Design a protein with these regions (language model features):
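The canonical Cys-X-X-Cys-His
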Residues: 47-57, 80, 84, 99, ...
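Sequence context surrounding c-type heme c attachment/ligation sites in exported
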Residues: 41-52, 61, 74-81, 132-134
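Solvent-exposed, acidic/flexible segments
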Residues: 36, 40, 44, 73, ...
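Short, low-complexity, Pro/Ser/Thr/Gly-rich segments in the mature regions of secreted, periplasmic
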Residues: 136-154
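Axial heme c-ligation environment in periplasmic c-type cytochrome domains
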Residues: 3-9, 62-69, 87-115, 119-140
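Secreted/processed peptides and extracellular or luminal domains of membrane proteins
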Residues: 57-60, 130, 154
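Electrostatic cytochrome c docking/interface patches
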Residues: 6-46, 153
Length: 154
């Protein structure tokens, strides 16, 4: 098992407006009034578009897939990324649980940081269940990165 993620506190913002922790991993920012950063909000949207069918609403888990809000407490960004890209198979207690490889799914991979920071915010209880009520505006850099990743020429 890889090194745990460490303190999720944001210590800096990169050129794309993403928040990073002391180890340089993507993390969330929640203001005292509950306003979340754009990427955490985007992660909520992307998680509920691509991940919640198996892993349950709000990262809470289901009968056949773990609660990711709990998993990311023990999983650093590199480990999370590797599992999402390559998949994972658990053989234990008479059950086979399979996480499919999603490395070719642009609807996941173009937003992998966003999904991770959303789950980190949920795991730290920085945000509750449901859609965040307030969020920062979408940075222009997020739009440019999205268009480049998805192949949109507009």
């Amino acid at each position: 098992m890889a090194e745990p993620p460490g303190d999720p506190k944001a210590v800096k913002q990169d050129d794309n407006g993403k928040y990073l922790d002391a180890k340089g991993a993507p993390t969330f920012s929640v203001k005292p009034d509950g306003t979340v950063d754009w990427y955490t909000y985007s992660g909520f949207r992307r998680y509920h578009s691509e991940c919640h069918v198996c892993h349950g609403p709000d990262g809470e888990g289901s009968t056949y897939a773990p609660a990711l809000k709990d998993s990311v407490k023990q999983m650093n960004y590199a480990e999370f990324y590797g599992i999402v890209v390559g998949g994972k198979q658990d053989l234990g207690s008479g059950e086979t649980k399979v996480m499919p490889a999603l490395g070719d799914n642009k609807n996941v991979m173009c937003y992998i940081d966003d999904i991770y920071v959303y789950l980190r915010a949920r795991s730290d209880d920085a945000i509750g269940r449901g859609r965040p009520a307030k969020h920062e505006d979408k940075p222009p850099q997020a739009t440019a990165a999205e268009q480049a990743c998805l192949g949109d020429k507009s």
